[in-house]
């Protein structure tokens, strides 16, 4: 990881908040032979008894499920906004164009849970994203037969996080005028550029 101190958050709560906000992750690992695998899943980020736990579910017997059973060391990559930064936006020339971005890498051991925990994560996931207790797609509206059939195809997991690294690269190494010019230019860009501009404004408050 791009590991420079000026691109690190001073407050660990900001890292946790970022993870919860950007919780559709790339979950990566390797099988026993070292073949890399990855999948993309929504997860929950919880603090339990002083430990950080990531939980979710994946398709049963997929290449990544089988690989994670062989080798439980995994990494969840949390992706945030990102945007191109042009050299022409700096007050001084020849400083090199670059990319601003925000990401967190959380690694640890994955374990697959029992049937009861699977039902709990199914309910939590469905109710969280439906966000409506009266939704016809809510967990409490699912038939027992459907839940039973669905649970045969997936498996729930928990990851006990033992290491977190992050990069919040937001032009912290630029002079004040360049910083403001970068924000102004990004504000004219697409949704990703505008999101980086907002993060840059907030980081200087």
Functional labels for PLM-detected ranges:
Residues 3, 20, 68, 158, ...:
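N-acyltransferase acceptor-side catalytic subdomain
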Residues 32-35, 46-53, 60-64, 80-84, ...:
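Short, charged/polar surface micro-motifs in flexible loops or helix N-caps
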Residues 61-121:
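Short, structured beta-strand-loop surface elements
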Residues 23, 39, 50-54, 70-74, ...:
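A generic structural signal for short beta-strands and their flanking turns/coil linkers
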Residues 1-53:
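An N-terminal domain-cap segment
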Residues 42, 57, 77, 109, ...:
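Residue-level recognition of well-ordered beta-strand positions that form the cores
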Residues 54-75, 185-205:
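An N-terminal domain-start capping segment
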């Amino acid at each position: 990881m791009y590991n420079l101190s000026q691109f690190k958050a001073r407050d660990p709560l900001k890292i946790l908040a970022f993870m919860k906000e950007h919780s559709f992750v790339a979950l990566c690992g390797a099988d026993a032979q070292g073949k890399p695998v990855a999948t993309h899943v929504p997860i929950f980020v919880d603090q339990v008894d002083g430990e950080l736990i990531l939980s979710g579910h994946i398709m049963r017997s997929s290449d990544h499920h089988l690989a994670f059973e062989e080798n439980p060391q995994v990494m969840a990559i949390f992706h945030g906004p990102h945007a191109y930064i042009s050299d022409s936006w700096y007050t001084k020339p020849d400083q090199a164009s670059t990319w601003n971005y925000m990401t967190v890498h959380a690694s640890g051991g994955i374990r697959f849970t029992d049937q009861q925990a699977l039902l709990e994560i199914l309910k939590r996931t469905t109710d969280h994203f439906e966000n409506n207790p009266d939704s016809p797609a809510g967990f409490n509206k699912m038939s027992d037969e459907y839940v039973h059939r669905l649970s045969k195809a997936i498996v729930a997991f928990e990851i006990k996080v033992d290491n977190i690294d992050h990069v919040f690269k937001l032009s912290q190494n630029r002079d004040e005028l360049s910083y403001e010019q970068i924000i102004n230019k990004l504000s004219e860009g697409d949704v990703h550029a505008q999101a980086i501009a907002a993060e840059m404004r907030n980081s200087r408050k």
